[in-house]
Amino acid sequence: HMDKVKAEAEADLNNAKVEEVTDVNGLKAVKITFDSGLLFNTSSSELSAASKTNLDNLAKLMKKYSTCAIDAYGHTDNQGWRNSTAEQSAQKNLQLSQQRAESVVNYLKANGVASSQFKNVVGKGSSEPVADNTTQAGMQQNRRVEVFLYASEQMVKEAQQGTLN
């Protein structure tokens, strides 16, 4: 079932990285990574006009697979903010990452995705880099929003009973 979700996500989401991962229960999950440069202006949590096509397509996908559970995680690079201490910058990055994750989730909810599908919406700040923060390219990769689609308890039960569509 998650294979279908992954295939459709790859077809519908331009400029997003779609991967199959294993969730905490050892089940397949689909991880969709959006470069935050595609979604937001620098230092902003307001969605850009360009991001809305991708998010509209994601909303359609999530409504189609309405039994999927969803987590959204915001991430930033480790760059400091002007006139801020390292500690203040880390706090601002954490807040920004949380606001970005919430912006994505609120947009999806406004486009018909059920609130009950969202399980975790978390800002990680710069705590989980995927690339080197000493280069521009690396920092860009670290500024991202990750959306995980995974089997809800309902889907797991249906799969075990053989009733999952």
Regions found by a protein language model. Name each.
Residues 76-158:
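Periplasmic OmpA-like peptidoglycan-binding domain that tethers envelope proteins to the cell wall
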Residues 35-37, 75-78:
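Short connector loops/turns at beta-strand edges and beta->alpha or beta->beta junctions
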